[in-house]
Amino acid sequence: MTEQQAIEALHALPRLPRSGASLERMQALLDHLGNPEKQFKCIHIAGTNGKGTLAAMTSSILTHAGYKTGLTISPYVLNFRERFQINGQMMSPRTLASLTRKVLDAADAIIAEGGEGPVEFEAVTAIAFLWFARQKCDFAVVETGLGGRYDATNVIPAPLVAAITRIGMDHTEILGDTLAEIAAEKAGIIKEGCAVVNYPEQPAEAMGPILGAAAETNTVIITPEMDDIRLLR
């Protein structure tokens, strides 16, 4: 399998699942792959605006601090392999082809057993997690694709940090048609045992579900003051 064949095979997978929103397909896929999602520490990022920027900055900080840091983002800008990075370097074409073959073989095994195969984003996320585990990353910075609660990335155990960027109206046909409903889905990445960092100027309507998720999981929300945030050059 070549890089182009791998990309075409991934794009040929369904975009939406037959059985609706669930983490069961993703968990089944990772179980077949040896559960790579349990082999690295994670910073999980959800929200509407600024996810990609925050993910890139967090990855850069950890890399410059001397940690081997994976990064998976969605979507990419110019090159499909932008979605898979370690210490700022994209996955090689050969590795993409090899890991795509492994993930698709696992998907075929699930289907042969009578299960439902993964959608494209689930397969892509599995490739990222498998690579991070094989490369023994210290950390992985993981950006959600859509929402949070049922996003394929949310199969990870409790992250070290769950970061919520600014919540806005997006994907209303899937996440809900109010800020509160959308925030509730994004806040689904908050798990017991993690730290939660919240955007300083979060809309009031979004705060209720975020505070509720923190209370349910016994986590503390850290909300920096906007005046305390500055870029170091």
Can you name each region flagged by the protein language model?
Residues M1-G20, G88, V142-L146, A162-I174:
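N-terminal-biased segments
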Residues M1-N49, T53-K68, V77-N79, K136, ...:
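N-terminal leader/targeting and accessory segments in enzymes
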Residues L23, Q27-K38, H64-P157, E173-L175:
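ATP-dependent carboxylate-amine ligase catalytic core
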Residues A28, M57-S60, T95-S98, K102, ...:
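Alpha-helical scaffold segments in soluble metabolic enzymes
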Residues I45-T48, G52, T69, T125, ...:
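Buried hydrophobic positions in well-ordered alpha/beta secondary-structure cores of metabolic enzymes
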Residues G50, M91, G147, D170, ...:
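Glycine-/small-residue-rich active-site loops that bind phosphorylated ligands and cofactors
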Residues I110-A112, Q135-T144, P159-R233:
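Acidic, Mg2+-coordinating active-site environments of NTP-dependent enzymes
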